């Protein structure tokens, strides 16, 4: 599961959950893949994400020191080198084994072989 995907996931479908975002991320294993950098595509992705959730995800893979704590005001004013760091976090890091945890109910959703399992039994929905 790429960190870009994590940024869009929530547990709002659970009973008694009002926000369910961002899901806490516990990473047991991840791999780094080499996905080709595209400046324009990276800027489009960054315009769509919630920056605070990216900070949380970056911390889960011990990479939070690579990005600024505050969201940059204009993505298109960043250098290619700066954008490559964001691209690396969003697209090159692939969580293979771990957990997503609902911030409200603490329901745990496993990540196995890079696939998050968001299915829950009817009693938990």
From Swiss-Prot:
Q: Which of UniProt's keywords are assigned here?
A: Cytoplasm, Nucleus
**Which Gene Ontology cellular-component terms appear in the entry?**
cytoplasm; nucleoplasm; nucleus; perinuclear region of cytoplasm; tRNA (m2G10) methyltransferase complex
Spell out the CDD domains in the cross-references: Trm112-like (cd21089)
Q: Which organism is it from?
A: Caenorhabditis elegans
Q: Which family does it belong to?
A: Belongs to the TRM112 family.
Q: What does this protein do?
A: Acts as an activator of both RNA and protein methyltransferases.
GO BP annotations of the record are:
maturation of LSU-rRNA; maturation of SSU-rRNA; positive regulation of rRNA processing
Q: Mention any Pfam family matching this sequence.
A: Trm112p
**Residue limits of the TRM112 domain?**
2-121
Localisation: Nucleus, Nucleoplasm; Cytoplasm, Perinuclear region
Disulphide connectivity of cysteines: none
User: InterPro entries, alphabetically?
Assistant: Trm112 (IPR039127), Trm112-like (IPR005651)
The GO terms this record gives for MF are: protein heterodimerization activity; tRNA methyltransferase activator activity
Q: What is this protein called?
A: Multifunctional methyltransferase subunit TRM112-like protein
Task: Check the record and name the Gene3D superfamilies matching this protein.
Answer: 2.20.25.10
**Primary localization class, coarse:** nucleus
